[in-house]
């Protein structure tokens, strides 16, 4: 009887020893652990590759300020916006290349390469006009076409975003503004003052003035016309002298 019990106990212990061990209890460095580590590393590597490819296909969104100040060439503008004459200004130009230095008295314009070239030729003829009567300006001014204007003050006194360029009929047009300002502005009256002013009785100085023109601006995600303020003239300001001067 005792021999039978011993035999059963030994058989039971041998069966327990021969049973497969659980993966949770496998010691480090065992083949099962190595397989799991290799599998985990492979999955992690594949996950990194997938994430990198996903980032390349779907780049991170830009900041709102970058989108607001960026180029508007991707914004398609309806040509009907330019059909109404009340939206046109002689100091606003839409062109595919930089316009000439001088300006023709025209309304909102669109210049292709050939038109701009012809106007450049006309501009060279008009750059140095001949004054036969000794005509002089009271204040020296300079006029230039301004590009890349991104912000301006509208007629309500608010800062608005100006469209630098627009996509019209699958062509990108830059928006230019013809601005005039004093060559050497001086906000304080000086003895010399403006040209041709009697300095014995008047103090004078030159200053840049502004006017409103209609420009294409951004309102949310769409283009709209607004009155914005730009430099348009250089004028002379005179102040009568008193006995205290």
UniProtKB/Swiss-Prot annotation:
SMART domains: NGF (SM00140). GO terms for cellular component: axon; dendrite; extracellular space; synaptic vesicle. Residues 47-69 are annotated as: Disordered. GO terms for biological process: cell surface receptor protein tyrosine kinase signaling pathway; modulation of chemical synaptic transmission; negative regulation of neuron apoptotic process; nerve development; nerve growth factor signaling pathway; neuron projection morphogenesis. The keyword Disulfide bond applies. Residues 19-125 form a propeptide. It is found in: Secreted. Coiled coil: none annotated. Residues 1-18 form the signal peptide. Keywords: Cleavage on pair of basic residues, Disulfide bond, Glycoprotein, Growth factor, Lipid-binding, Metalloenzyme inhibitor, Metalloprotease inhibitor, Protease inhibitor, Secreted, Signal, Toxin. PROSITE patterns: NGF_1, NGF_2. GO terms for molecular function: growth factor activity; lipid binding; metalloendopeptidase inhibitor activity; nerve growth factor receptor binding; toxin activity. Disulfide bonds join 139-206, 182-234, 194-236. InterPro entries: Cystine-knot_cytokine (IPR029034), Nerve_growth_factor-like (IPR020408), Nerve_growth_factor-rel (IPR002072), Nerve_growth_factor_bsu (IPR020425), Nerve_growth_factor_CS (IPR019846), Venom_nerve_growth_factor (IPR020433). SUPFAM superfamilies: Cystine-knot cytokines. Its main location: secreted. It comes from the Eukaryota. Glycans are attached at residues 148, 151. Expressed by the venom gland. Residues 47-66 have a biased composition (Basic and acidic residues). Nerve growth factor is important for the development and maintenance of the sympathetic and sensory nervous systems. It stimulates division and differentiation of sympathetic and embryonic sensory neurons as well as basal forebrain cholinergic neurons in the brain. Its relevance in the snake venom is not clear. However, it has been shown to inhibit metalloproteinase-dependent proteolysis of platelet glycoprotein Ib alpha, suggesting a metalloproteinase inhibition to prevent metalloprotease autodigestion and/or protection against prey proteases. Belongs to the NGF-beta family. Homodimer; non-covalently linked. This is Venom nerve growth factor 1. The lineage of its organism: Eukaryota, Metazoa, Chordata, Craniata, Vertebrata.
């Amino acid at each position: 009887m005792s021999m039978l019990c011993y035999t059963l106990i030994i058989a039971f212990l041998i069966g327990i020893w021969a049973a497969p061990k659980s993966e949770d209890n496998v010691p480090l460095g065992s083949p099962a652990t190595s397989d799991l580590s290799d599998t985990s590393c492979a999955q992690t590597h594949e996950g990194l590759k997938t994430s990198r490819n996903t980032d390349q296909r779907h780049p991170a969104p830009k900041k709102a300020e970058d989108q607001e100040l960026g180029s508007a060439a991707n914004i398609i503008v309806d040509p009907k916006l330019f059909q109404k004459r009340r939206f046109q200004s002689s100091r606003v130009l839409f062109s595919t290349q930089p316009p000439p230095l001088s300006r023709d008295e025209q309304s909102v314009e669109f210049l292709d390469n050939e038109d701009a070239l012809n106007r450049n030729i006309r501009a060279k003829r008009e750059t140095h006009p001949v004054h036969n009567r000794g005509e002089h300006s009271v204040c020296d001014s300079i006029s230039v076409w301004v590009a890349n204007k991104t912000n301006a003050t509208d007629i309500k006194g608010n800062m608005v975003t100006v469209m630098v360029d627009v996509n019209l009929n699958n062509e990108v047009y830059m928006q230019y503004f013809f601005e005039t300002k004093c060559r050497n502005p001086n906000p304080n009256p000086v003895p010399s003052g403006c040209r041709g002013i009697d300095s014995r009785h008047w103090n004078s100085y030159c200053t840049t003035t502004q006017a409103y023109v209609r420009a294409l601006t951004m309102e949310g995600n769409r283009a709209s016309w607004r009155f914005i303020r730009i430099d348009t003239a250089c004028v002379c300001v005179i102040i009568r002298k008193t006995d205290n001067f």
